Amino acid sequence: VTKPVAADAWRYPYLWHRQHGDGETEGRKTRPVAFVAVLPGKAGGTNLFILAITSTQPGRDRIAVRVPEIERRRAGLDPIPLWVIVDEYNHDILESPAYFEPGARIGAFSPSFHKKVISAFIAAVRAGQSKAIPRAD
């Protein structure tokens, strides 16, 4: 099984913060996501920090990074306007079996675009503006 690395784009059943707040535990559909960070955990396991990619233009109250056309192609995404949402994220553990299917990797962003996304994500986290949605059991 291919393991995700930072800057990868995969298909994943992302659980939105509003859905989590309503008591849902499963993402309603598989969507493109970006792995903003893949880090070893203190207790073992691999921590995954997963950002949703959406074609719905974010409102002014959301924090997002628009995906340029060249990056959409690199990541294997649809040729339509897309945004990476950085004000919420799914936190999952790679070794928890639930959500990763073979062949789910669709591409990867360039190092320069990934740096832009991770910078926006870190800024949102530090400002207390990015909400974690835990996915691991």
Regions found by a protein language model. Give the residues of each.
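Short N-terminal edge-element motif at the start of the domain
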Residues: 1-3, 11
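A broad, low-specificity signal marking well-ordered, structured residues that form hydrophobic/aromatic
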Residues: 10, 48, 65, 83-84
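Compact nucleic-acid interaction/catalytic patches
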Residues: 20-30, 36-73
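Pocket-edge structural micro-motifs
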Residues: 14, 52, 86-88
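C-terminal terminal-subdomain/extension
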Residues: 2, 67-137
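Generic short beta-strand segments
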Residues: 11-18
